[in-house]
Amino acid sequence: EPSIPSATNRRVISYRLTLAAPAVLSMVGGETSTVDTRPCISGSTVLGTLAWRWLGQQRPACADPAGNPEFRRFFLDGSVRWLNAYAESQNGKRLLPCPLSMVRRKNELDLAFDQASPFFEDQVKEEPNTQWKPLDLPFVRLKETEDAEGMVFRLRGLQPKSTTRLHHTRDDREAGRSKNGVMFSYVALDAGERFIGHILCET
């Protein structure tokens, strides 16, 4: 996409990623028998992938990548910052991680309220019987508007599609099967999921 001008001497380059195949971007921690996946593509993953591709194109001419000024500028010295690629909304916008402080009324999906707001306490007092629920969405786009309820957020959210697959462990290498029927699962982002990321670089 065209670069976005910045108020500083840096520019923002937007890029889109579409998964051509299911992707597992494993997260640290969790159950030992389950491999969960991140709901976004981290900037470090994008950096590593493009650095590997750059090296593949430059070999064998670039024998010492760490000593190559171009490689250092793109991938090592911080001149270029690779930001996370987050889910793309239905209208082609980059969504952002949902703040933990955002909640909604039970059974109401299009309005969100910020518990960190100094006015939220008044909202709770005015609605003593309201049940407040976390948004439970990894990515959202919030548009602040004013209506009869005061300042509220119109909510647009997205949960990237993923699939969980089950497999037997293969601790019996010769037979190629599990000795005790032990299974493990992994979660993969589905092929076709779209993401938008940003690259910050000098003008």
What are these regions (language model features)?
Residues 1-203:
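Conserved active-site/ligand-binding neighborhood in enzyme cores
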